[in-house]
Amino acid sequence: MSDHDGKSGYLTCSFCGKGQDDVKKLIAGPEVYICDECIELCKDIIAEEAKLEDDAESGPKRLPRPSEIKDALDEYVIGQEKAKKILSVAVYNHYKRVEMVQDGDDIEIQKSNILMLGPTGSGKTLLAQTLAKLLNVPFAIADATNLTEAGYVGEDVENIILSLLQAADYDLEKAQRGIIYIDEVDKIARKSDSPSITRDVSGEGVQQALLKIIEGTTASVPPKGGRKHPQQEFLKVDTTNILFICGGAFSGLESVIKQRSGTKALGFGAEIKEKKEEGVGEILARTEPMDLIRFGLIPEFVGRLPVVATLEELDEESLVRILKEPKNALVKQYQKLFEMEKVHLKFTDGALVAVAAEALKRKTGARGLRSIIENAMLDVMYDIPSQDRVKEVVINEDVIRQQGKPIIVYDCAESA
């Protein structure tokens, strides 16, 4: 071969012009050459463009039917059959409405946001998260108790939209098709039946502030969060196609419903029913808009949440199923952790019942299951990584009740 002076025989990359001595490899094509550095650069460009295409196609490629949405929810959420059916239909109709708006149809379908009522730990947040994951849309959670109306110490309602924007990597189009779950919405109920002349900055005022973004408006969002100030530049976000799901335990609402139901049963023509103890979920299932207004939600706010899904209180059997049946069940999660240590973890049926019973005793629902298991397994999770030849760990009822230690099975064959 000749030298670097452009004489025949000396090969150069057809893209960057570097000579064969300046690169590690040159790949030959018909009358062209490409070096290893240009190949790496091309790979990066292709990967970046593929990512941009994926982002542009955010959202489901085909909107799942209500039955398909419910089937997906069944994989992660145990029980709550009626609530899952209501949510599946509501979410399907919402995104059909979004598609129709984009197609420019002249018939306007009004937005239907969702209100979920149910005891603590019954699965409200998990349902909302699972829906967003299934539909491949950005998702944000806000705590209503942190919100105050504009001008008071606390968080502006627009910061909820900022959380969604951040979840969408500041992609405006994606964010405007997302889902926002507002938790503890019962805590912003008005403190009395009649409007107060004093300011209720974390109650009725917040409901009023939420009204516009929930029904659909162009919100001015501070890009870095915090309070608004005149010198700041704002991001304009259209909330018309954002699905809002509000949730809360609504403790005390059952009394309002019972009171209303009781007045209807008075008089000679009243139907006499046999008295039986009703669960909180059964009572909440009879919720009417007027009950929510009496509880402390303003009529306009109730009107923006036309779809109401009530969740039942979880019993022991449901909690045991939650521990072992869903795709990401707690038992499977802990078994995976131990599997990484090459140890098989087994929970006896008695242990699972004991965990469920303790959660019921604490009145924490499914939310308290993890802390009970963590507490019971702290010592064994501390010791196992330092021990050799451990084959299996068995967690029984006594371990959960702090009355015994886990059974550890060693691999004798390995020590022989």
From Swiss-Prot:
Keywords annotated in UniProt: ATP-binding, Chaperone, Metal-binding, Nucleotide-binding, Zinc
Any one of the GO BP annotations: proteolysis involved in protein catabolic process
CDD domains: RecA-like_ClpX
Keyword Metal-binding attributed: yes
InterPro entries xrefs: AAA+_ATPase, ATP-dep_Clp_protease_ClpX, ATPase_AAA_core, Clp_ATPase_C, Clp_protease_ATP-bd_su_ClpX, ClpX_bact, P-loop_NTPase, Znf_CppX_C4
Role played: ATP-dependent specificity component of the Clp protease. It directs the protease to specific substrates. Can perform chaperone functions in the absence of ClpP.
Protein name: ATP-dependent Clp protease ATP-binding subunit ClpX
